[in-house]
């Protein structure tokens, strides 16, 4: 999913809204038709389009018109025009990948990057936007976001400092790549060969088949630090010796990344200082919903403290189980996953294979749409539309009898589709410079087991949760009602709350009354038993407090590390200090977790890892507001739609939440959701 935060940032994105157009017989179409006329010529056509847009931007910049309507309205229309051309390619390259789509996509990206850089360096446009004000709150939010985007790109810096910032950005990118490459090299360099069958006796056949190989004509089992292989042995590996060996290798990967971290931290601090922030954590919050570094730290510490007591109980139960079953008296970190899985099986006797026959894809999809319809008083009608694969399903959305949006579902795996699941926004609800209203559309993409002529697509419960999650992103965009494109739908929504609506909707996928709507055996049509339904929720909350404490540890380390400049051994000392309140087992000295923390050193989560739990508190609190003893609380659900979904990025999420419920979200709601007693 792509997230737009400002005019400057949106030109970088690969997903944009699409303008309305006429079809071949001159009849107005409500939605863009999915097609690409000529893949081979696409990059050349894009080059011409971008040149035309830059000429238009130059004309806007040089004009005497300094009104919002004369400057920012047409600039947002250009975003639509660009998306009108580019979205079909970016989407097609992900869902029907081929040499032709990849070639066109790769040739297009440098053009978009250059285009974005040109806009970022347009000092005259920046000065013009700074003079604009509006009495319309949505329009003023667009203005504020755009000014912020220019400032954070260094538009107000003197020339020499601007060059320094550009050099820092380039070096940061190089260091992030180095961190990733070092980690990849270290991951690929390790192999653990097991020759004795008894040491792999408990590993599921599907995992064992991946590990099985031959050396000198003898069958052996090779495990690596690739996540599926690593987790397979840590979770099911019988031998403590081998669990320790692979755990030590994983925790001590890429020691050369320690120097990379020092360089990254130094440059991030320099970048923050150049842009007049005290720290990189403070810089990070400039585009987020959290208001201060103190607020984030207090939130994390409160969450950790409230989960601590139950986490200790969960660990003691685990240690007692290991002692009872295998006589383990010196319980270690490399024992946790193995005994957690064994205890889970003893307590619940449950796995996904028991529920999969009850989750037929078509019934799950229809059931989910019914839930959304009932919650938000909308209607989904299946329609015929041009699509990229015959298994894609398309629905138009109606609100109070009026057409309000369109959603495409591409749910089954195929070799041409990249892995994972995502929501890709397409058209956006807004009013253009000519006063015409545009309707939103979006793609929901998953990789569920394919259906055949004889057998339907059956989902694991995790798949059901994934579908609800991505639909939560979808309705955040599709239910947007703002007139200003840059803050409508998911556009302009802060990074630390973008997962709020998705996590909100996925919560319903664990509720027995919801699952009963569509959990029927695909052959006998028998409903899923109450026993199985209860186990789905019970296993979700298994060792939840330990999980929360672990996430708090990661988040506190990330955020505090970016509060000031830490170098060398100071980094490990900070992590050790945080672990005094979050790590319930001693951590061996060889553990250098930070050297593999790619989320913050090679990804987009630097000083932002807290976002996962920040958004989850909102989603849990909203969930409990929207249900009551009779099922859905329609009044609260209507308010959620009005204040949270309809208003998109037009106001800070904390303000919208206050307007909806008249209070701040409660951390206790998240703890309640995970069955953690306070």
Where would I find each of the regions flagged by the language model?
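Short His/Asp/Glu-rich catalytic/ion-coordination signatures at enzyme active sites or charged loops
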Residues: 30-41, 89-108, 132-167, 224-258, ...
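C-terminal, non-catalytic "cap/extension" segments appended to globular domains
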Residues: 29-39, 44, 48, 62, ...
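N-terminal helix-rich structural modules
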Residues: 26-202, 626
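Active-site-proximal, well-structured secondary-structure segments within enzyme catalytic domains
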Residues: 138, 142-143, 171-174, 181, ...
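Short, positively charged and aromatic/hydrophobic N-terminal segments
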Residues: 14-25
């Amino acid at each position: 999913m792509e997230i737009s935060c400002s005019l400057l940032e949106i030109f970088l994105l690969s997903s944009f809204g699409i303008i309305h157009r006429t079809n071949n017989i001159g009849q107005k179409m409500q939605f863009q038709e999915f097609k690409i006329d000529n893949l081979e010529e696409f990059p050349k056509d894009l080059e011409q389009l971008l040149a035309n847009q830059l000429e238009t931007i130059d004309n806007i910049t040089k004009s005497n018109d300094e009104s919002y309507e004369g400057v920012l309205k047409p600039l947002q229309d250009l975003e639509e025009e660009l998306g009108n051309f580019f979205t079909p390619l970016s989407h097609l390259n992900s869902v029907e990948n081929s040499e032709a789509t990849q070639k066109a996509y790769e040739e297009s990206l440098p053009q978009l990057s250059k285009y974005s850089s040109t806009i970022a360096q347009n000092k005259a446009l920046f000065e013009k936007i700074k003079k604009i004000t509006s009495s319309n709150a949505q329009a003023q939010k667009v203005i504020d976001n755009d000014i912020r985007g220019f400032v954070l790109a260094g538009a107000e810096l003197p020339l020499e400092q601007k060059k320094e910032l550009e050099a820092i950005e380039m070096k940061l990118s190089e260091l992030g790549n180095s961190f990733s490459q070092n980690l990849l090299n270290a991951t690929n360099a390790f192999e653990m060969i097991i020759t004795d069958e008894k040491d792999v006796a408990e590993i599921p056949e599907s995992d064992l088949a991946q590990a099985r190989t031959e050396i000198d004509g003898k069958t052996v089992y090779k495990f690596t630090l690739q996540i599926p292989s690593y987790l397979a042995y840590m979770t099911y590996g019988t031998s403590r010796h081998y669990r320790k060996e692979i755990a030590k290798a994983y925790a001590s990967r890429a020691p050369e990344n320690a120097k990379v971290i020092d360089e990254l931290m130094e440059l991030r601090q320099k970048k923050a200082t150049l842009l007049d922030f005290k720290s990189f954590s403070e810089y990070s919050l400039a585009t987020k919903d959290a208001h201060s570094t103190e607020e984030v730290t207090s939130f994390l510490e409160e969450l950790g403290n409230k989960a601590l007591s139950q986490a200790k109980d969960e660990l003691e139960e685990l240690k007692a189980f290991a002692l009872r079953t295998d006589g383990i008296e010196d319980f270690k970190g490399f024992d946790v996953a193995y005994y957690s899985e064994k205890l889970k099986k003893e307590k619940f006797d449950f796995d996904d294979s028991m529920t999969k026959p009850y989750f037929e894809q078509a019934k799950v999809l229809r059931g989910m749409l019914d839930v959304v319809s009932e919650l938000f008083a909308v209607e989904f009608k299946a329609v015929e539309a041009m699509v990229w694969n015959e298994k894609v399903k398309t629905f138009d959305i109606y609100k109070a009898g009026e057409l309000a949006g369109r959603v495409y579902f591409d749910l089954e795996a195929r070799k041409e589709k990249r892995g994972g699941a995502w929501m890709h926004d397409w058209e956006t609800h807004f009013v253009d410079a000519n006063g015409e209203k545009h309707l939103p559309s979006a793609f929901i993409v998953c990789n569920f087991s394919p259906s055949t002529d004889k057998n339907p697509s059956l989902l694991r419960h995790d798949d059901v949760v994934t579908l609800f999650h991505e639909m939560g992103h979808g309705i955040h965009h599709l239910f947007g009602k703002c007139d200003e494109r840059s803050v409508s739908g998911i556009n302009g929504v802060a990074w630390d709350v973008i997962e709020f609506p998705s996590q909100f909707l996925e919560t319903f996928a664990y509720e027995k009354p919801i699952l009963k709507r569509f959990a029927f055996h695909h052959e006998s049509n028998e409903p899923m038993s109450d026993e199985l339904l209860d186990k789905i929720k019970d296993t979700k909350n298994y060792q939840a407090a330990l999980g929360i404490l672990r996430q708090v540890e990661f988040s506190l380390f990330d955020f505090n590390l970016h509060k000031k400049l830490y170098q060398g051994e100071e980094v490990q000392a900070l992590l050790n200090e945080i672990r005094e309140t979050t790590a319930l087992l001693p951590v061996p000295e060889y553990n250098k977790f930070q050297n593999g923390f790619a989320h913050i050193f090679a990804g987009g989560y630097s000083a932002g890892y807290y976002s996962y739990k920040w958004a989850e508190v909102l989603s849990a609190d909203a969930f409990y507001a929207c249900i009551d003893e009779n099922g859905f609380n329609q009044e609260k659900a209507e308010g959620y739609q009005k204040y949270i979904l309809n208003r998109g990025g037009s106001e800070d999420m904390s303000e919208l939440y206050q307007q909806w419920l008249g209070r701040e979200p409660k951390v206790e709601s998240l703890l309640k959701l995970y069955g953690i007693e306070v």
